[in-house]
Regions:
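N-terminal Rossmann-like dinucleotide-binding module
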Residues: 1-48
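Structural signature of beta-strand start/N-cap positions in the alpha/beta core
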Residues: 5, 29-30, 65-68, 91, ...
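Structural motif
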Residues: 9, 72, 95, 121-123
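Short alpha-helical
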Residues: 13, 39-40, 76-77, 100, ...
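Short helix-capping segments at alpha-helix termini
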Residues: 26-27, 88, 113-116
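Beta-loop-alpha module in the N-terminal Rossmann-like domain of NAD(P)-dependent dehydrogenases
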Residues: 48-110
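A contiguous active-site-proximal alpha/beta segment in oxidoreductase catalytic domains
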Residues: 99-129
């Protein structure tokens, strides 16, 4: 059975923690990383031995090896990035709040895409990774 490909958007401190957790998994592999600051994506990909890095979310979403997108951008931007990811039909993992307010979350078009579950990352790591 091949592993499920994770594409990571955002390269901050939380992203490092996710990368270390994913590296320990036999079920998942970190196949692609992107950050709007391309130099950060490059250094992150070298540090975590990821073959593909991008300077834009759009390029990450064009990567056919990405099955799930782990959105690790600062939370005020999650509601902006989420619809673009969801429109590809991929599952999205977001550890932080979707938006700074309920109104922004509702306006992010989440209801259009279906199921949403609050799943703290620590529970995700212990149950899946």
């Amino acid at each position: 059975m091949s592993s499920i490909g994770i594409g990571l958007y955002g390269t901050g401190i939380a992203a490092d923690n996710h990368a270390y957790a994913i590296a320990k998994s036999s079920k998942f592999s970190l196949v692609s990383v992107a950050d709007e600051k391309y130099n950060l994506a490059q250094s992150f990909s070298k540090r975590h031995h990821i073959d593909r890095c991008h300077g834009d979310l759009e390029y990450l979403l064009e990567d056919s090896s990405v099955d799930i997108v782990l959105l690790a951008s600062p939370f005020p931007f999650n509601s902006k990035h989420f619809p673009f990811i969801a429109e590809t039909g991929r599952s999205v993992i977001i550890e932080t709040p979707l938006a700074p307010s309920l109104k922004e979350a509702e306006n992010s078009r989440v209801p259009k895409y279906g199921w949403v579950k609050h799943c703290p990352c620590s529970a995700l790591r212990s149950n899946i990774w």
